[in-house]
Amino acid sequence: MRKDFGFEQRPMVDWLAPGQLTQTGIKSVISDIFGSYADKRDVMAALHPKPEIDGDYSQESELWIDYAADLGDGFDATYTVARTLAEPQLSLEHGGQTHVLPRGRLLVMGGDQVYPTASFDEYFNRLLKPYEAAFPRSPQGQEPHLYAIPGNHDWYDGLSSFTRIFCGQGWLGGWKTQQRRSYFAVKLPHNWWLWGIDIQLEGYIDKPQLDYFYRQSLDNVQANDQVILCVAEPRWVYGVTKGAEAFRSLRYFEDRHLHQLKPARLKVTLTGDLHHYVRYESKDGEVQRITAGGGGAYLFATHGMPEKLALEEGFKESVRTVEYEKKASFPDTATSKLLTFGSLLIPIRSWKFGLFLGVFYTLFSWILQSASKARPDLLAGSRSLMEYLQGQSLGNGPRVLKTFAALIVNTPVSVLLCLLIVGGFMAFCSARRKIARFVIGSGHGVAHVLLNLALMWLFAHVNTHGFGLGIDSWRQVTLFVLEMLLFGGLLGGVL
């Protein structure tokens, strides 16, 4: 980590490193357990009880808004995005024409401003200082304004750091923060509004926040005003891929505050969380739902996103089905499919993960080999599992699997290791539905156990028949350990 500028220029988070996985998992559990007892939104509402709007730009004839989400990861990516946002103007070529885009009068940060988990130290090194280096503080009166909503990574410390940075009307580089809460309402020109809501903690919207937007709808929003809504997750996608419940709280908010109180028109919903760009448009062309999580975190595939969505919008008696179609994405589908081959490099890019799997496979093999010497009755007369495997051809696959399973069941430590790896993959499975998490996670774990068996079988043949080494010789044992660490780590990392 370089410290040339008074802060650590940190690398991208290695999400697959065993230590990082453990740390993130523990903090996630702690956040889930204690988060509801440390909800800063109640405190913010008590300190600022008046439901005032956070910014009024309605008198301006033209207003440009920049948007970035999923930001504070590695220095290189974060600084690149920050420097692009700081440019006075950008010139883009499209359709044979040059379009000049001025820097936004407002910058909206759409969630997950820091990785891997929220703390002031991580914000300082991964967000504050890179943005300050890219865009130092502007002269008073000329500064662009900043608004932000928290994502799940911002919530890991109960919003303590988020509140300190974004809700004190301070500075983030050359941008001046304006809001007093983790949500905001901003009045834009030409009867438009920009609302940012906080729905991260347990997926619900707290009552003070609902009251705040209730007063905005009742007192400030006029009939047929148009609203841009910023949220931290693309719940319209999760409602299709992870169950209708994922879309429920957002449905309620939209129906209650944008349709029932006053017939305002929701025109655009902006979010991050998925690290790509995908835009869905309603069938009548009136509503855009946009995921734009390209603020610097790792790129997420787009080719698996649904081409069409049929969303149940509204709540209770006002429920209706609205159809959406995917209109644009970055990367495009072909490029996204091509980029997936980069997963083959995971054992190299995340070598700690590959090494962990190699060590796990080696340990598992050692335990089974040792246990098998006490159960020759399971090995058709062979003295050990490796001796048994080197004498089995591929045609005996079912018999080998049966023997392998019998050894595991009769070795308590092996059972515990199997439960550990299966449970680990279930815990870190990204599927929201419990049944999907169970099926995918357990299947992934079992696949690693089977890969371990296949490698033991392969190395038993290669080392004895190919190199002529005795099963119990120190040369064979040393070679086996090296093979399992190398090839187990590489193949396991890809799997």
Predicted regions and their residues:
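Acidic, histidine-bearing metal-coordination/catalytic regions of metal-dependent phosphoesterases
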Residues: 1-109, 114-116, 121-150, 156-185, ...
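Conserved beta-strand segments of the P-loop GTPase G domain that flank and frequently precede/overlap
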Residues: 70, 109-110, 195-198, 230
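Extended active-site neighborhood of metal-dependent phosphoesterases/phosphodiesterases
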Residues: 118-228, 238-326
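Active-site beta-loop-alpha junctions enriched in small/polar residues
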Residues: 232-234
